[in-house]
Amino acid sequence: MKRIGILTSGGDAPGMNAAVRAVAGKAMAEGLEAYGINYGFAGLVAGDIHKIEAADLDGVIQRGGTLLYSARYPEFAHEEGQLKGIEQLKRFGIDALVVIGGDGSYHGALRLTEHGYNTIGLPGTIDNDIPYTDFTIGFDTAVNTNVQALDRIYDTAHSHDRTFVVEVMGRGAGDVALWSGVSIGATAIVVPEVDWDMEEIANKIKHNRANGHRSNLIVLAEGVMGAQEFVEKLSEYGDFDARGNTIAHMQRGGNPTAKDRVMASKMGAYAVELLLAGKGGLAVGIQNNQLVNHNILDLFESKHDVEVSLDKLNEEISFK
């Protein structure tokens, strides 16, 4: 093996650049060449590929986004797209690949391995919805971004005795909402994995107001419903002077936290070690602070465990 390709795919996540840097840096340290593939699988098929030089990696570990850019390319699910991608890999003499992204990206990684190109997947998504890893690259930064925004929303909510419903990302998973909500002492956290009742939430707001609490923040996972829809349904149970707010794509940008930088660096270097050992079709993760790898097929047959106990914790320590 002489050349390793690297691509980022799907939604960007803070820390992707740290992962790219780690893969390329480890490859160079092992006497290999690293090639960057722009715009994910779309760029692979189009041949948008370049050699990564050491100077290209200066200052990237602290940058958000992805220096390799990203795109969604559903056409890669079909064999025609996969074969076009393989043609480009052969053209550039790339022997193996590291794919950084979410579960859709892992499907592409598995297909390439089946076609004879060892490929390793790294979990790059703020949603934290990948099985067999405690945390995904970008999750910690997204939660910290939310906490900063929610703290600011709390200030204005407190000034006006208002209720705010703040929608956060996570796709179908509630991790982002749960961690963000506990971190700011939310009145309620609403996620897909936990049963909830609108009337109970309304009664809690009324109870809080009656006991001198001037503001209420509800953290809402986007997989449940939108913030404005939630506000409208909440208004059926009383006049709460509620406002809907969506933090949106701010969660996917910004300088990655130290945790995301270190985790991405560990995973990236480990991916190269696996490729040097002749392995492919694997997904890298961190469990109990240890690097692990699992067959990508196992991920498709499993479901990420959301820490739903955080919702109970938030209920127990909230003021009654």
Curated annotation (Swiss-Prot):
SUPFAM superfamilies, per database record: Phosphofructokinase (SSF53784)
GO biological process: canonical glycolysis; fructose 1,6-bisphosphate metabolic process; fructose 6-phosphate metabolic process
Pathway(s) annotated for this protein in UniProt: Carbohydrate degradation; glycolysis; D-glyceraldehyde 3-phosphate and glycerone phosphate from D-glucose: step 3/4
Residue sites binding ATP per the record: 11, 72-73, 102-105
Keyword terms, alphabetized: Allosteric enzyme, ATP-binding, Cytoplasm, Glycolysis, Kinase, Magnesium, Metal-binding, Nucleotide-binding, Transferase
Principal place of residence: cytoplasm
Superkingdom: Bacteria
Gene3D superfamilies: 3.40.50.450, Phosphofructokinase domain
Residues that, per the record, bind substrate: 125-127, 162, 169-171, 222, 243, 249-252
Cofactor (UniProt): Mg(2+)
GO annotation, cellular component aspect: 6-phosphofructokinase complex
Places the protein is found: Cytoplasm
Molecular function (Gene Ontology), one example: monosaccharide binding
Residues at which Mg(2+) binds: 103
Active-site annotation: 127 (proton acceptor)
Enzyme Commission number(s) of this protein: 2.7.1.11
Enzyme class: transferase
Function, in words: Catalyzes the phosphorylation of D-fructose 6-phosphate to fructose 1,6-bisphosphate by ATP, the first committing step of glycolysis.
Subunit architecture: Homotetramer.
Family label: Belongs to the phosphofructokinase type A (PFKA) family. ATP-dependent PFK group I subfamily. Prokaryotic clade 'B1' sub-subfamily.
This protein's name: ATP-dependent 6-phosphofructokinase
Gene name in the database record: pfkA
